[in-house]
Amino acid sequence: MNLTPDESAALVDEINSLTGSQTSVQVCVCPPFTSLPVVSSKVEQSEVHLGAQNMHAEPSGAFTGEVSAEMLRSLYVSHVILGHSERRQYFGETNASINSKVIAAINANLRPVFCIGETLEEREAGKTMDVVGAQVREGLVNYPSSALDLLVVAYEPVWAIGTGKTATNEMAQEVHREVRKILSEIFGESAASSIRILYGGSMKPENAAGLLAQPDIDGGLIGGASLSSKSFCDIIEAALSTQA
């Protein structure tokens, strides 16, 4: 919950000027709902995609304060973050409720950025793979293979976000490899190999290159570093360097 519409617009202007017309790295910005209209106009003629931070599973109805997939589509939103760790922690979202949102998103031709990840307590208890496995399997129930081109998965080790603790490149890769294995079991090896799996555990300019060099880490779900255009663009540069 950061940035007013004016602040969001200024940030996107800076990102547009710094990223130029490069197309090698796909860039998506996900401002608060209140900033979507102004940011939509800013990215319309650029290579930057527009995403939202959440949505409701129902297309319409008496759900005060919620936003539907079609409302997002009307603002030219292409991506939507679903199941973020903060939504799970503070708003009680479950694997089942997140699954409903994921299906609603693809039915509206939105790209769900489907978030998974374990807490510190779960990691220290050795339950990481069990927790992440359940989140993937239950969160993607009835997901059609025909819509796999829309699916993006984001691994957020909750224990590494704003805690001072960090996941090593190897620790992150280990979970990403397991996630891809589970996706392979659900959708087949060939399909799983093409699904993007992002890392969302406090990626920043200092650690981006090492993380993005891992074979199963396909990008980043950037948190605090995205509030600075320089930090955000430095991460984009790190991504470009791994393609060289």
Model-derived segments and spans:
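Active-site loop-to-helix "anion-binding N-cap" substructures in soluble metabolic enzymes
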Residues: 1-244
